[in-house]
Amino acid sequence: MYDATTPSDPPEPSGTPAYRTAGSYTLPEVCGRFVAASASRGRTAATAGAGVLTDMMQFTLRHTDTRTEARAGELATDHGVIRTPIFMPVGTAAAVKGIFHRDVRDEAGAEIILANTYHLYLRPGTKILEEAGGVHRFSTWEGPMLTDSGGFQVFSLADCRKLREEGCHFRSHIDGSKHLFTPESVIDTERAIGADIMMAFDECPPGDAPREYAAKSLALTERWLDRCFERYAQTQPRYGHYQALFPIVQGCGYPDLRARAAENVRQYDADGYAIGGLAVGEPTEVMYRMIEVVNAILPADRPRYLMGVGTPTNILEAIERGVDMFDCVMPTRNGRNGQLFTWEGTTFDRRYSKAYLHHLVTCGEMMAAQIASLHNIAFYLRLVRAAREHILAGDFKEWKEAAVAKLGRRL
């Protein structure tokens, strides 16, 4: 058994392995079943409930900056088109904390939100989500949605989880009940939730993990990834819209492990690719270097998603390095704690003075968290929209350098 409190010994297959060990497979072995299933899916459009499914998610690059790797594109889903670069507000339990969906969409301008498989699995559970017709109908969010697989949440539960080859045993943070996540069960759960973009199940090791731990953890993630895509190919969407599956690149702060992981995931010919395991304790310069290593290998014609990052400066630096999609709890979490992100002190909603906002925060009024959270999400979305405009205009580099200089100031 792999105990999270003893990170030197991740599990490895023993005897005759049920799943391939990392490095022992060839491209046809890893991808043959998935590629064949993908081709079949493309030839015969599956139907489920309301309509006919598209056979894949379409990503169109509109412009790539000539002096950086920054890109402007469009990602077409069955629930709408997402203009990239994009920030995805985090709605862990299918709700962005403290804000109405209409305000997230209409006031802040969100085009896609993120929910979490781990939390939705525990509450309300897949049975209720299935009876409701999926997370879109359940939550009344009509736009695109992405679900994280729960790998990071499992990483966060270090004191109450254990990893094995089959998957992850953990105790609920709610009531202490015992559960098991496997690559197969996570895909089944994400199918039941019904988000437009699903994430593969992975292990997210600490950013400063020793190399031996990082290598064994990556090998486990790669074996799990093969099982995720096999299950994905065996199942169909349930609610009449296409669901993409993004693999996740791990490897901590080791360039060779990151490169190996990127080479491995690109073999799946997925609709998009995610970079995980960053902003989890490693120095910022290491994070930027890992993004560069990975993006040099990932296909240029697919969206790249940097998971859980980050500050406004982090986002602009990552856009410069070729990242298209972001999520982070920082806008809402910091908003609930009275911190606002601004351009030189200007607030998003000018109906409220800064004096009044300060008053609400010091009084502990619920309205303070709501206004501040909406303001911060609007700030993040305006930031990535501005980045997109300057990429298209051809002056992204100059604008980004000036913006980063301003973003580092505290008012």
Predicted regions and their residues:
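Intrinsic, low-complexity polybasic segments
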Residues: 8, 17, 37-38
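Glycine-rich phosphate/ribose-binding loops and adjacent secondary-structure elements
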Residues: 219-222, 231, 235, 242-351
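Gly/Ser/Thr/Ala-enriched C-terminal appendages of enzymes
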Residues: 329-385
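Radical SAM enzyme core and accessory elements
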Residues: 383-411
